[in-house]
Swiss-Prot record:
Its EC number is 7.2.1.1. Its cofactor is [2Fe-2S] cluster; FAD. Gene3D superfamilies: 3.10.20.30, Nucleotide-binding domain of ferredoxin-NADP reductase (FNR) module, Translation factors. It is a single-pass membrane protein. PANTHER family: NA(+)-TRANSLOCATING NADH-QUINONE REDUCTASE SUBUNIT, NAD(P)H-FLAVIN REDUCTASE. The lineage of its organism: Bacteria, Pseudomonadati, Chlamydiota, Chlamydiia, Chlamydiales. It comes from the Bacteria. This is Na(+)-translocating NADH-quinone reductase subunit F. The keyword Transport applies. [2Fe-2S] cluster binds at residues 76, 82, 85, 117. It catalyses: a ubiquinone + n Na(+)(in) + NADH + H(+) = a ubiquinol + n Na(+)(out) + NAD(+). Keywords: 2Fe-2S, Cell inner membrane, Cell membrane, FAD, Flavoprotein, Ion transport, Iron, Iron-sulfur, Membrane, Metal-binding, NAD, Sodium, Sodium transport, Translocase, Transmembrane, Transmembrane helix, Transport, Ubiquinone. It comes from Chlamydia caviae (strain ATCC VR-813 / DSM 19441 / 03DC25 / GPIC).
Length: 431
């Protein structure tokens, strides 16, 4: 009976531990509500009394505006890396922070320009906000599906009301609102095909509890490029990569948290409700006759798909369009069948798939590991397969989206070939 006694003791200890955790969580919540003193602050916008908002002190200006129905874009999720949540405080601006000094000129700082994700609301302020942000809106959507399309990338499909369509453009993005939540990564198997389990098990990623139940509302909203194009409304799509902690001995570092927004999205199931705001974006299509080259890697597939499908299926463009897409292996490739069909249906569309680390089964299926235009880093394959053969590379428009190293490699390569920065449309969320 000794082992039963030990099991009983462990069960009691676990129960006590859980109860203590709940009590401490309750104390924190109560303390925040009753002990942290806040006061009402007025935010006067564009010198228009009708736009004045009353908010509680202590929160960031970004979250205060969002909660007041003015969703300022913050693609990086409030980490001060994308530099897009700029607001001009024309009265009662606090001293600039280091993040502000790294973003704005001395003259701009004196004029009151600040990053709203870093600015705390402590008193009344007068703000100047661009009209396009005042016209942004929020929508509630229902998750249709949330399946893995690669080992660490999901395709989130959401249905919004057809009566209130989102007026977005291809290449645009929406912010996803993150509420307080708690999840366990083993539950994510419900929306993950078994073929992806082995890599998650190899890195010990299952059975990890991610507790953001005390998350301050609107403190971690993040923007994601749309993978859909407007003709697909009322359905919208995103490709979203999970932000895991760095690995130590094939396991996530327990000292570093998982990505707040990506973990929330990976926990979503069909039928769940989510809130998005926007639309935003600058990386739209330039309407001219210049030929197009898309250089896309990983979850940048969202950006590429939105533009390419709109050009071919909606606008019936006759422009020459080339897509170079880079993935590690065939298992990590996204939208291959869709692009291969487009290549058959449209003579002006050309699709090149490049694998950096093809698996043995990829080689067995016929993938040529010795062809440097197929097995390589994407920027090298692109140079060998197309760029070095162009007589006038500066005549093309280049749409670039992918991981930071992908983006920097492509930009350096194009610069080496004399391509002006104005001919490169980069979708980069400051990651």
């Amino acid at each position: 009976m000794t082992w039963l006694s030990g099991l009983y003791f462990i069960s009691i200890a676990s129960l006590v531990f859980c109860v203590i955790g709940l009590i401490l969580s309750g104390i924190i919540l109560i303390s925040r509500k009753f002990l942290v003193k806040t006061h009402a602050c007025k935010l006067k916008i564009n010198d228009d009394d009708s736009l004045t908002k009353t908010v509680d002190s202590g929160r960031t200006l970004l979250s205060s505006l969002l909660d007041s129905g003015i969703p300022i874009p913050s693609p990086c999720g409030g980490k001060a890396t994308c530099k897009q949540c700029k607001v001009k405080i024309v009265k009662n601006a606090d001293q600039p922070l280091e993040t502000d000094r790294a973003t704005f000129s001395k003259q701009q700082l004196e004029q009151g320009w600040r990053l709203s994700c870093q600015t705390k609301v402590q008193h009344d302020m007068c703000l100047e906000i661009e009209e396009r942000y005042l016209n942004a809106s929020s929508w509630e959507g229902t998750v249709v599906s949330n399946d893995n399309v690669a080992t660490f990338i999901k395709e989130l499909v959401v249905s919004v009301s057809p009566e209130h369509p989102i007026p977005y453009k291809p290449g645009g993005y929406l912010q996803i609102r993150v509420p307080p939540y708690k999840t366990n990564t083993s539950d994510w198997k419900q929306t993950m095909a078994p073929e992806y389990y082995s890599d998650w098990e190899h890195f010990n990623l299952f059975d990890r509890t991610i507790d953001n139940s005390l998350l301050e509302l609107d403190s971690a909203n993040k923007a994601y490029s749309l993978a859909s194009y407007p003709a697909e409304l009322p359905v919208i799509k995103f490709n979203i990569r999970i932000a895991t902690p760095p690995f130590i001995n094939n396991a996530p570092n327990p000292e570093i948290p998982w990505g707040i927004c990506s973990s929330y999205i990976f926990s979503l199931k069909p039928g769940d409700k989510i809130t998005v705001s926007g639309p935003y974006g600058e990386s739209f299509m330039k309407e001219n006759n210049r030929p197009l080259i898309f250089l896309i890697g990983g979850a940048g597939s969202s950006f590429g798909r939105s533009h390419i499908l709109d050009l071919l299926l909606n606008k019936h463009s006759t422009r020459d369009i080339t897509l170079w897409y880079g993935a590690r292996s065939l298992k990590e490739n996204i939208y291959q069948e869709e692009y291969e069909k487009l290549e058959k249906d449209f003579s002006n569309f050309h699709y090149h798939l490049v694998l950096s680390e093809p698996l043995p089964e990829d080689i067995d299926s016929g993938w040529d590991k010795n062809d440097p235009e197929k097995t390589n880093f994407l920027f090298r394959a692109f140079e060998l397969g197309q760029l070095s053969k162009l007589s006038n590379p500066e005549d093309y428009l280049y749409y670039v989206c992918g991981p930071p190293l992908h983006n920097s490699s492509i930009l350096k390569l194009l610069d080496n070939y004399g391509v002006e920065r104005s001919s490169i449309i980069l979708d980069d969320f400051g990651s």
